[in-house]
């Protein structure tokens, strides 16, 4: 009888865990309603980031590398991305990181966050929204799909035609394979995407119906 009771308790906790995990994922599939857009953007705006941290990521470690970029932008601190990778939770096979792992790592490093899902908005509204966050001095991490791979990168600035990023999947330098090349040396960040390029990558990101057009806006605590 006692064994039967223990079995039922275990089953209960397994079901509860499944419900909690599904709840966390499901809530993030709900669109962010009521977003206000300010179309009076600057021609150009950006947040400062150290060019010393334009590292090329190790296998599937885009989440901790994106967090490294956020920490540097908001605090000026240079963190070891591999140390951040070791601290990252919510990981599955081959180091793939669920958004909750990204959020937890940001919180652990005293970065406040707010999540959004912009799947119900137009592409133009998404572009305006990204610019609004930069104008508010808040960097953003987006979940995108690059060459059939789910990927996180950090948006740090914009001009009229596109966006400046720190992207740990940028091509490696020939002379130092731990560092990446830089698309536009006169800009902040190591990667530049046109408006259409970044929106297409963002639209393709997410897992089926979950985390579509998902973003996390970051700020100082």
Task: Give the location of each predicted region.
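A structural preference for short, hydrophobic beta-strand core positions in alpha/beta folds
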Residues: 115-116
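Extracytoplasmic/secreted envelope proteins and their assembly/folding machinery
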Residues: 63-71, 81, 85, 99-103, ...
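Active-site-adjacent structural segments surrounding the nucleophilic cysteine of cysteine proteases
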Residues: 3-95, 146, 159, 219-220
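Noncatalytic regulatory segments and standalone regulatory/sensor domains
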Residues: 28-32, 92-93, 135, 158-221
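Active-site-adjacent substructure of cysteine-protease-like catalytic cores
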Residues: 121-170
């Amino acid at each position: 009888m006692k064994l039967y009771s223990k079995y039922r308790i275990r089953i209960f906790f397994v079901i509860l865990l499944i419900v909690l995990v599904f709840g966390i994922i499901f809530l993030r599939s709900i669109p962010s309603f009521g977003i206000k857009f300010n179309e009076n953007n600057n021609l150009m705006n950006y947040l400062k980031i150290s060019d010393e941290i334009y590292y090329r990521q190790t296998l599937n470690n885009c989440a901790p590398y994106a967090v490294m970029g956020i920490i540097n932008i908001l605090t000026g601190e240079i963190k070891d991305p591999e140390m951040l990778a070791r601290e990252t939770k919510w990981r599955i096979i081959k180091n793939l990181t669920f958004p909750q792992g990204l959020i937890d790592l940001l919180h652990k490093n005293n970065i406040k966050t707010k999540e959004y899902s912009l799947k119900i908005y137009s592409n133009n509204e998404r572009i305006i929204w990204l610019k609004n966050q930069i104008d508010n001095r808040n960097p953003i991490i987006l979940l995108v799909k690059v060459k059939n791979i789910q990927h996180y990168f950090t948006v740090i600035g914009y001009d009229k035609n596109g966006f400046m990023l720190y992207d740990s999947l940028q091509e490696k330098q020939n002379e130092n394979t731990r560092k990446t090349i830089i698309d536009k040396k006169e800009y902040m960040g190591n990667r530049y995407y046109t408006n259409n390029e970044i929106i297409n990558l963002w639209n393709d990101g997410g897992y089926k119906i979950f985390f579509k057009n998902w973003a996390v806006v970051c700020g100082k605590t």
